[in-house]
Amino acid sequence: MNPFEIYLLRPPEGGAPADTILDALLGDGRVALAADDPSRAHYRNPDTGAFFSLLLASEVTEAWEARLAAARRAADEDAPPPPEPEEDYDGGEDEDFEADEDGGAEPDVEQAPVIITLPLLVMEFFMREALAFAEALARTADLAVDLHAGTEDGAQASSPAEIAATWLGARDEAVAELAEKNGGAFDLKLHAHHSVRIQLCVWSPAKAAAWWKYGSARRALAAELGPRGVVVPALSAVRHEGTVKSLCEWRPGTPCVLPRTDLVLVRRERERKGLFRTRKIVQEGLVPNEQIWKILAAHSELRAEPADLLVHRSTPPPIAARLEAMALEPLEHARNALLLGVVDLGSEPRA
């Protein structure tokens, strides 16, 4: 399955220097350099779960390595200075392109300071988030966003709508092919000698949108409600009963926001009396979200934005008693999962 690539290209006049591109990449802390390959980086949004890879041109990689070396020298003044680069990129006309038979220039990978590699077997918001990231990077670093490594002179770059439509079409084809050939299962390589079998899972567009809207707004909610002692939990994905479900964590008795997830990881404190002292233990387990909503809804603030959620501030004794009586499903019945292999379609793909 071919990866889907979004190119950030320099305009004919050259664009911003590599350091500006690097500053834009590192701006919000979601991009990290790959440990085993300095030419690759990874984007991950811990609030939404979106992720994708980036391939960096040598000019950006060298700027990154120079910055790391400068930080090391600051910590060790006796370290020798790095060698001077032989030649700086100036964006001029003397680039080493190999002309084709028509006299044009073959595009060089160095034309693209950054290439975003986006997975296909994911929900639509991955693409929307990657496209927004690319457009913001392009504005800051004076780059062009395109579906192609190079465009002919005078040709317009791909529009955001064209990129989105192309990705959606490629995603639908990949899902249909996977469903037809492998029954919706594929192997995910974790490293060179280990892979796991993953079954394709479908969420409704409404469920995917609610996940993304809540995750995108979680920090704003925390800024609003956190000073009042209300916890705003992060979302996570778990594999449970053969499919991937959404989950958040809650401690009964703690003021909190409760989004509409599939499951809630409940952590409740119990007192255990010993011979000489009483100690607190934490009991953990899973509860269907709908069960907790039915108990808390009448005593909580209901909000529809950014997605359906409860703001629960206090727990009257009768409500606390009902919460204490809830049966907890063993935590071992769920395990952490990536959102890779989870797609948002209107119906299940047919084999």
Locate predicted features:
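Acidic (Asp/Glu-rich) sequence patches and key acidic residues
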Residues: M1-A351
